[in-house]
């Protein structure tokens, strides 16, 4: 498409994205925060965290003295973009963090780089790499699962252990370490996550570390039931809208707002080029659905798809560095007929493509037929498989039907095959499921898929709220995360309506970070409650700035507060506009606490209540 034929609104969006890329620098971004690094035993292991600095607590009304509040370290997915000391240049990409570890293992070798041959001749579109991709040396297996089964603790595992503990050893306050036990439905909770624990979980197949050796820019992370619940963000262009600049902007924006992984679901023009820009600039693992690009190669004609074209696409993406593939190998021909009576049929793009191909050719799904070959390729690059739920329900009416669970059983069979090749596996799940039917999805997945990590889209709990499906799905996501789901795929406000923009990405991520964190609290994940306790303490002490800064979205929290009390004095007030100065429950509760401390009262009695007259309360307001 020529630039002159692009609608004006699209040109503006693209220009804004280009300006964002050109001006991008490492930045702490969030107020009163700084980048810190946790040092591992291995000298090259430095784990990034964001540390939120807090204000001291005023003890006494007239400022008799202050008590310090320790800074709160939080998990940070922003990579180099969150470090103001790092120079960012999206045209050269990020630092190749894991390359030193990959080379030290001496079990992979460079291969000729033909990726540049696939790039557009337009220099504005192409990202020219100056390195050769690698693959496993002959006879070697290089997956994190292989290392874990061999008893090897890799630097990636050490990195992850530090990251999952979230720097909580830096906090000495007993108040902040208070936590409810939670209920984890039989999960294996560790009070302190060690590199050995990470190794054991990966070896058992209960967790995966997506880490293609050709994406050394990514920072190690783990997806598993016994770790923090993760969130994936989907980006990617379509045949109708978006550009490379906008997708790179969305990538950076997504990692800033907490995306643990990102999937590039591009289906429009320049799929290869878009993916290269994303990979070279991504500090988080990148997933794809390869069938989309394979279909583009046959000009969208499904019956022209074949195994050779698909395998060529896998190889191309493997050499670029894709960390996990969604493969719809469980959509068997006999299961397709089970969807005929559904209200909404097959709603997965990949699932519908393979279903149509099977029916047109009257043949079994070629992804299923060639699954062992897919595994061999993945083992040579350490690409994880995300076994797609091509028959997931697209409406609450179709939830938990025979087609859905038949496919799930097949995904369990494929999981065992992948493990024979030491390939890491996770299982994708629904979809649209009403609340009372969600738990079965988790229990059946654990049973039939041998506790491989579960990765779900929501699920959406009702179908009546287009424009608010980040809410309808966030409810289901929190619940299934509590039951044991390892990663939640976000849903944006644009779900069912259109391609999400930058702001939609943020809204979807905030909703899903809330859901994931709520699940971690419910499971009793060690250290999950520290930030909540810090927020509650700041709220009770009317430290408004700290309340804003501890929030998932400090900017929105501050904006809402300042809509009614914008003055600087409002940040020092012992009330907000909801209750005002006379009816603030926390202000009154604080007076009661101060009074009991002043009078050394240990228990509440009728005589104590009688003492709480106006003069007593006023004197206690110190």
From Swiss-Prot:
Stretch list, region Disordered: 109-130
Residues where [4Fe-4S] cluster binds: 576, 579, 584
Residues engaged in binding Zn(2+): 432, 496
Molecular function terms from GO: 4 iron, 4 sulfur cluster binding; carbon-carbon lyase activity; zinc ion binding
Alphabetically ordered keywords of this record: 4Fe-4S, Iron, Iron-sulfur, Lyase, Metal-binding, S-adenosyl-L-methionine, Thiamine biosynthesis, Zinc
First-tier enzyme category under EC: lyase
Cofactor: [4Fe-4S] cluster
Domain of life: Bacteria
Binding-site residues, substrate: 234, 263, 292, 328, 348-350, 389-392, 428, 455
Recorded family membership: Belongs to the ThiC family.
Quaternary structure and partners: Homodimer.
Full protein name: Phosphomethylpyrimidine synthase
Lineage of source species: Bacteria, Pseudomonadati, Pseudomonadota, Gammaproteobacteria, Candidatus Palibaumannia
The gene coding this protein: thiC
């Amino acid at each position: 498409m020529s630039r002159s034929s692009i609608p004006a609104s699209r040109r503006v969006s693209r220009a804004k994205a280009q300006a964002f890329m050109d001006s991008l620098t490492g930045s702490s971004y969030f107020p009163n925060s700084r980048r810190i690094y946790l040092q591992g035993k291995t000298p090259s292991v430095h784990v990034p965290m964001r540390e939120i600095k807090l204000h001291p607590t005023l003890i006494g009304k007239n400022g008799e003295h202050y008590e310090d509040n320790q800074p709160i370290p939080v998990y940070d997915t922003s990579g180099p973009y969150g470090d103001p000391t790092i120079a960012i240049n999206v045209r050269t990409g990020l630092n190749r963090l894991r390359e030193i570890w990959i080379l030290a293992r001496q079990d992979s070798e460079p291969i000729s780089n033909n990726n540049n041959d696939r790039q557009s001749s337009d220099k504005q579109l192409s990202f020219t790499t100056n390195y050769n991709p690698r693959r496993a040396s002959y006879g070697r297996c290089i997956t994190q699962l292989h290392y874990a089964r061999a008893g090897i603790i890799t630097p990636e595992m050490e990195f992850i252990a530090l990251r999952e503990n979230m720097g909580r050893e830096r906090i000495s306050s007993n108040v902040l370490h208070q936590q409810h036990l939670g209920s984890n439905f039989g999960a294996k909770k560790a009070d302190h996550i060690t590199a050995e624990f990470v190794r054991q979980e990966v070896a058992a197949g209960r967790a995966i570390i997506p880490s293609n050796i050709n994406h050394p820019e990514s920072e190690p992370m783990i997806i598993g039931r016994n770790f923090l619940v993760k969130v994936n963000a989907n980006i990617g262009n379509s045949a109708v809208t978006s550009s490379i600049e906008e997708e790179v902007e969305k990538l950076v924006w997504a990692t800033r707002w907490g995306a643990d992984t990102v999937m590039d679901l591009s289906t429009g023009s320049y799929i290869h080029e878009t993916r290269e820009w994303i990979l070279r600039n991504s500090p988080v693992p990148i997933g794809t659905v390869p069938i989309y690009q394979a279909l583009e190669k046959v000009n969208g004609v499904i019956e022209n798809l074949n195994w050779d074209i698909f395998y060529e696409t896998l190889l191309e993406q493997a050499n670029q560095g894709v960390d996990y593939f969604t493969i719809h190998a469980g959509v068997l021909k006999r299961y397709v007929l089970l969807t005929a009576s559904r209200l909404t049929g097959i709603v997965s793009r990949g699932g519908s493509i393979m279903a149509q191909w099977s029916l047109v050719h009257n043949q079994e799904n070629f992804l299923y037929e060639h699954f062992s070959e897919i595994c061999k390729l993945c083992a040579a690059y350490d690409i994880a498989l995300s076994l797609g739920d091509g028959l997931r329900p697209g409406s609450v009416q179709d939830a938990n039907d025979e087609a859905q669970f038949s496919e799930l059983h097949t995904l369990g069979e494929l999981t065992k095959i992948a493990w024979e090749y030491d390939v890491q596996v996770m299982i994708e799940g629904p979809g649209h499921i009403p609340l009372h039917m969600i738990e079965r999805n988790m229990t059946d997945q654990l049973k039939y898929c041998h506790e491989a990590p579960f990765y779900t889209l929501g699920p959406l709990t009702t179908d009546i709220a287009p424009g608010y499906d980040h809410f309808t799905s966030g409810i289901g996501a929190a619940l299934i995360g509590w039951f044991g789901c390892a990663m939640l795929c976000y849903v944006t406000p644009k779900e069912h309506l259109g391609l999400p923009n930058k702001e939609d990405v943020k809204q979807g991520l905030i909703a899903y970070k809330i859901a994931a964190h709520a699940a971690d609290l419910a499971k009793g994940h060690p250290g999950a409650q520290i930030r909540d306790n810090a927020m509650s303490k700041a709220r009770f002490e009317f430290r408004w700035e700290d309340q804003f800064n501890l929030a998932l979205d400090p900017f929105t929290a501050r904006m809402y507060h300042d809509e009614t009390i914008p003055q600087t004095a409002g940040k020092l007030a012992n009330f907000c506009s909801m209750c005002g100065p006379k009816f603030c429950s926390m202000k009154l509760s604080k007076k009661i606490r101060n009074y009991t401390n002043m009078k050394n009262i240990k228990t509440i009695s009728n005589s104590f209540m009688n003492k709480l007259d106006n003069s007593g309360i006023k004197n206690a307001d110190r």
